[in-house]
From Swiss-Prot:
GO terms for cellular component: cytoplasm. The gene is pdxA. Its cofactor is Zn(2+); Mg(2+); Co(2+). GO terms for biological process: pyridoxal phosphate biosynthetic process; pyridoxine biosynthetic process. This is 4-hydroxythreonine-4-phosphate dehydrogenase.
Length: 307
């Protein structure tokens, strides 16, 4: 069977993305046919910063139509509008290749959201771009590994705005889309307030969550969704034995336990997108950029998922 062709967007070149590309290429090449969306010159510069530890000549690259950012010992680990613009163009090209079926999937390396903002990119991140590009699809950010998966009802929004987003109709649509994509038989849904609201004592959001769960189960014809569960105990070992699938109303409530347990091996997947996309579950790690310290397990797992 022919190996799948995977487009790999470079992420922010001032972070660990290029180190991950170089140190992982031999393993990645065994799983798929990687196409690195980056100018070869930048990979050469990255390898020089990594003391020429890796082979660069055999990597299949595609130049990006964007000015080359500076990459040297004084720029690494720093936010740059040029690097932000370049990482966005690399990602956008990956989506274009996937849309035209020139690649089978895309793997996105970490971007810096502030760099995108400085480059006047009108999207918070990868998932926000995908939601705008594919508006007819209920795209869901899910992170996890085989032991634990967490779908995020809200992702990169301020915590103070989440309460207003919790509406029965929107949550029912989300829950049904999550179940359809994952085919999960049981999904545990985290509550929003302390003690899942304590029957309305601590806010009304959890009452809406309960109604959405009931309506979703009724639509499915079986009790798929459990909850809302008090989030402080939802990820206890006995709860995780019930199912690996969870839904969280907010970003950190769901991802804090996931990353505490499985940070190195988890990946980020865009459910319900018309293209196949996966990513690492970590950021640019500016603090260890070009020090040969980056753990590549999450990146390799993302590639394996796509391949």
């Amino acid at each position: 069977m022919a190996k799948k062709k995977i487009a790999i967007s470079c992420g922010d070149i001032q972070g660990v993305g290029l180190e991950l590309i170089l140190k992982s290429h031999k393993e990645v090449n065994a799983f798929c046919e990687p196409l690195y969306l980056i100018d070869g010159e930048l990979l050469e510069r990255a390898n020089q910063l990594l003391h020429n530890a890796y082979e660069t000549k055999t990597l299949n690259t595609l130049a990006i139509h964007s000015p080359l950012p500076l990459l040297n010992s004084s720029t690494i680990g720093k936010v740059s509008a040029q690097s932000g613009a370049y990482s966005f163009e690399s990602f956008k090209k990956a989506c274009e290749l996937a849309d035209s079926k020139e690649v089978d999937g895309i793997c996105t390396l970490p971007i810096n959201k502030l760099a995108w903002q400085q480059a006047q990119i009108p999207f918070v991140g990868h998932t926000d771009f995908l939601k705008q590009r594919y508006k007819d699809h209920q795209i869901i950010m899910m992170l996890g590994c085989s032991k634990l998966f967490v779908g995020l009802f809200s992702d990169h929004v301020p915590l103070g705005a989440v309460s207003q987003l919790i509406q029965v109709k929107a949550l029912v649509k989300f829950l049904l889309a999550f179940q359809k994509s994952t085919q999960a038989k049981i999904v545990q849904v985290c509550g929003f307030n302390p003690h899942a609201g304590e029957e309305g004592l601590f806010g009304k959001e959890d009452e809406k969550i309960l109604k959405a769960i009931q309506k979703s189960n009724q639509t499915l014809g079986f009790e798929c969704f459990l909850g809302p569960l008090p989030a402080d105990s939802a990820f206890a070992p006995n709860k995780r034995q019930i199912t690996p699938f969870y839904v969280s109303m907010s970003h950190d409530v769901g991802l804090a336990p996931l990353k505490a347990l499985y940070f190195d091996e988890s990946i980020n997947v865009s459910l319900n997108a018309p293209i196949l996309r996966a990513s690492t579950d970590h950021g640019t790690a500016f603090d260890i950029a070009y020090q040969n310290k980056a753990n590549n397990k999450s990146y390799l797992n993302a590639i394996k998922y796509l391949a």
